[in-house]
Amino acid sequence: MVNDIIADSITRIRNASIRGQEVTKLLYSKIVEAIVKILQEKGYIESYKVVEEGNKKFINVVLKYEEAGKKKRPVINEIKRISKPGRRIYKGKDEIKRFKNGYGTIIVSTSKGVLPNDEAYRLGVGGEVLCSVW
């Protein structure tokens, strides 16, 4: 059993993109689905699909790559878990304005749901910083 499903999902995505895999399978939870949806909206992944195998649900994530000469380079340069079960990190709306000069995204769990940093700033809400990606 996984203690931190968000960290597990982020690690699976990071490892699959480093290895050049097209698809990776994540354990299902509503918060992981919300994170993956944001990654798709921001263009970090190609697509995702929730599948059921027996009595368990999974999320199949199709990773996105750029052509760099003869090699394919992952679109996700770095994806990192920020707030952890042992040490929660909360930021106010003014502290989550920009990340990596606008080239990266911070995913925040707010009272209005799981949101990217630009949308949370626009709505004027802060929250728990789940992860960063660029």
UniProtKB/Swiss-Prot annotation:
NCBIfam families attached to this UniProt entry: PRK00136.1 (NF001109)
Organism: Nitratiruptor sp. (strain SB155-2)
Family: Belongs to the universal ribosomal protein uS8 family.
Protein's UniProt name: Small ribosomal subunit protein uS8
Record gene name: rpsH
Coiled-coil features, chain-numbered ranges: none
Biological function: One of the primary rRNA binding proteins, it binds directly to 16S rRNA central domain where it helps coordinate assembly of the platform of the 30S subunit.
GO cellular component, one term: ribonucleoprotein complex
Protein's GO biological process: translation
Sorted UniProt keywords: Ribonucleoprotein, Ribosomal protein, RNA-binding, rRNA-binding
